[in-house]
């Protein structure tokens, strides 16, 4: 007996898992993990499946993390939120704004659960989770022991954290602690936000502008399956960026604190005239080249072939090799996404 994963991944790819368990508390989560381990099955914990591509049927147990709850403590200088890992991220952003606690508005409409946010160190429009994260609570899957990691201990990087490295498959995130400063400073460095006046802008206006940009550029997964930005924005050495800018002076580029330069993957793909290109049922989105969509009952093979095609074209033109932001899941667990499309 197998269970379809189609409802549990926003790409809408139709693969199956041996078992799917919905965990609404820590005990259910640990019990499901221990049961699978006893049976010698692979096991993975999934939020809303908005950043994964299942390559084939999964041979084990998928645990859906649905631990809910939001607690707020107010101090003189900040609001401290303790949020269950199974809460929806965008609903949390709205909750904070509705309760006059600004600071998350640039991260509006990022799909997925709160518990997934530190894994990827989610970010958009100049703000990353690490800017507001206070701590992450997790449990060791083998022992059931509770751990609280400070933001520094999470070792956040660009779409990276300790949870994608040493702690992968070792812990389950059960809650995230956020600190929202009462000295709110709008971040208006990207897109339409640069048109807003930092002296008069409200958090609600930033939220509305971010939602407008995302809804006009990004496809709704309910209409066309997708996992948001498929590729990371490449971060390259300064000399490589200089060389590229000599050839393409209008290329968007963002100098980083360490001297490296972040490039816009969507722009690179667009310059290769790849918008609308299809392989099988998979397509490059016509409005936002960074997004690959399930346009017509795509298989995972279609998506992988399209991602390979995009990576090759960009690499040949710019000598910059894109890496997927989406996580690739094989029969027994996560596999190397770069190798899968190389």
Curated annotation (Swiss-Prot):
It comes from the Bacteria. GO terms for cellular component: cytosol. One of its GO terms (molecular function) is FAD binding. InterPro entries: FAD-bd_PCMH (IPR016166), FAD-bd_PCMH-like_sf (IPR036318), FAD-bd_PCMH_sub1 (IPR016167), FAD-bd_PCMH_sub2 (IPR016169), MurB (IPR003170), MurB_C (IPR011601), MurB_C_sf (IPR036635), Oxid_FAD_bind_N (IPR006094). Pathway: Cell wall biogenesis; peptidoglycan biosynthesis. It is found in: Cytoplasm. It catalyses: UDP-N-acetyl-alpha-D-muramate + NADP(+) = UDP-N-acetyl-3-O-(1-carboxyvinyl)-alpha-D-glucosamine + NADPH + H(+). Its EC number is 1.3.1.98. Its cofactor is FAD. Pfam families: FAD_binding_4 (PF01565), MurB_C (PF02873). It is an enzyme of class 1 (oxidoreductase). Residues 13-183 form the FAD-binding PCMH-type domain. Keywords: Cell cycle, Cell division, Cell shape, Cell wall biogenesis/degradation, Cytoplasm, FAD, Flavoprotein, NADP, Oxidoreductase, Peptidoglycan synthesis. GO terms for biological process: cell division; cell wall organization; peptidoglycan biosynthetic process; regulation of cell shape. The active site is at residues 159, 229, 325. Belongs to the MurB family. PANTHER family: UDP-N-ACETYLENOLPYRUVOYLGLUCOSAMINE REDUCTASE. Cell wall formation. This is UDP-N-acetylenolpyruvoylglucosamine reductase. It comes from Salmonella paratyphi A (strain ATCC 9150 / SARB42). The gene is murB.
